[in-house]
């Protein structure tokens, strides 16, 4: 898959899974949040996501994919804490403000619709999108 070759050329895989705490002044809901420490070690974050449906948010795209910065053990806590769609969406916006990616790439060549994000039906869309603003990409 090319990962071994990339590491041999000097690429560094995310290995620091320490949980860190951050603060965001002016946050809508997530003034304090937890994230994975490797973000602090990165020269840049590039967000790769697959366009698909999501039961709570309607879809998973660039902005929602940044929920991936939250450590796995904390994700269920955040789903419980921000359990209505508007608060969950505000938390996603806060995370994107606190730890912004430099580039977002959306794979919408074949999306998924239906009971997302883990089940559904493949749907040919035929798009590959990239940009600096995750919210703009999500609106396209």
Task: Annotate the PLM regions.
Residues 1-140:
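Extended, low-polarity segments enriched in aliphatic/aromatic residues
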């Amino acid at each position: 898959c090319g990962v071994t070759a990339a590491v041999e050329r000097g690429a560094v895989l995310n290995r620091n899974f320490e949980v860190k705490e951050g603060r965001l002044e002016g946050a809508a809901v997530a003034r304090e949040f937890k994230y994975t420490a490797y973000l602090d070690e990165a020269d840049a974050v590039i967000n790769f996501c697959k366009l698909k449906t999501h039961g709570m948010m309607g879809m998973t795209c660039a902005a929602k994919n940044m929920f991936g910065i939250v450590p796995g053990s904390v994700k269920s806590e955040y789903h419980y804490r921000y359990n209505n769609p508007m608060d969950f969406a505000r938390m996603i916006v806060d995370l994107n403000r606190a730890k912004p990616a430099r580039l977002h790439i959306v794979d919408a060549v074949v999306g998924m619709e239906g009971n997302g994000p883990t089940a559904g039906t493949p749907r040919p869309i035929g798009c590959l999108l990239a940009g600096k603003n995750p919210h703009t990409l999500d609106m396209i």
